[in-house]
Amino acid sequence: ATGERSLIPTFVLAMRWTGDNKYVAKALSDLTETEIKTWHEAYEWQELNPQIIPHESYRALKMRFLGNTDRNFLDFFKDPYGKRERMKIRLEEISWGGVLVDVGIPSLDNPPMIDAKDADYLVDDDLVFGVEINGDVRAYPLRIMGWHEMFNDTIGGVPVALAYCTLCGAGILFETEVEGRDAPFVFATSGLLYRSNKLMFDRETRSLWNQFTGEPVVGPLADSGIKLKIHPNTITSWANWKAKHPRSKVLSIDTGFIRNYASGFIYREYFASPDLMFPAVVGDESQIKRKEYVFGIQQAGAAKAWPVEAFRDRRVINDTVGGVDVVLIGDAATRTVRAYEREAGEVFNDDNDGELETTGESWAVTEAFLVSRDQKHKRVRVPGHVSYWFAWNNYHGVKSELYSE
């Protein structure tokens, strides 16, 4: 019956909190007419069936579960913002990520930086998020950011936050100053997830934000229309970044927190596994597997992703996304991809000496531009980022095109 099916989200919640209880699973299987044995299966069925509206008692029950874990969770769902009609995502698809609000995964706020020459804790193969804004060059090692997943900082005079979702493999650099707001947003980790993607929150309004899109989805700002500007950042090895930017600043290992910041320690098993830690519907994997890395660009209402492995045997790809011609320069070994606009008909090639070339012209690769050797022409950097394929293809609301050779 329709009324009984409204209880499905309640049983999905019970599957999580009872540890896949077989009696709850049997009830769910009967209601959904689908064999369900685990919370992962139940959650994925729920994601695929948005027509199921939860029973009126669902919200109170979910708040009880969350509140018993950490009463700070309740701040995100206060009336009237926690009502179904005020939220941009379904309450039943919001799940606990296993940590408390802003405690288990604390953000780094204006963290101490040191000179590259003094960063003796890093080894050449360590990956970093490299950032350059207005000549201010910084590196934030993934081995540290994996523990914190968020920094709030000012780079080149621009207030920014890097939100790193380890579960979906994406580190995205957002500008946090928004027109009409008195002060830049300061972000932290909520401890909640949506389809295996972190929900961050801003400390001022305590609205929940989609980490992948930079948009508020629950809370006072959900109807604001705010969408944070994305700045380019580059994943690369410390050796490559240091060679390209010897005067770079780098995040100090003295963060003020006690963590095991050793190379390759954080999330080692998850990064090596083909499986997801938390449930999310995964689409067709005939071309690319769920946890293969892609570099994605979204613009002009279109989205496109390039497998990072496509750069294993080539450095340069000329392509188009959303009607805009782009050139991508990558290195699969270090998960590095940079993208730049190019003019119509312009084709870039690798000169095998670290630069690019077009007909009769050489170009230097910088963090902000491609610059012609005579300094007369520039091609602007296009914001994009690396993530797992399952995440890129699941969070935009736009079906992504996938590059194939």
Regions found by a protein language model. Name each.
Residues 2-7, 19, 30-38:
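Alpha-helix capping and inter-helical loop/turn segments
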Residues 12-14, 23, 33, 37-405:
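Mid-to-C-terminal functional-domain signal that highlights helix-capping/loop sites
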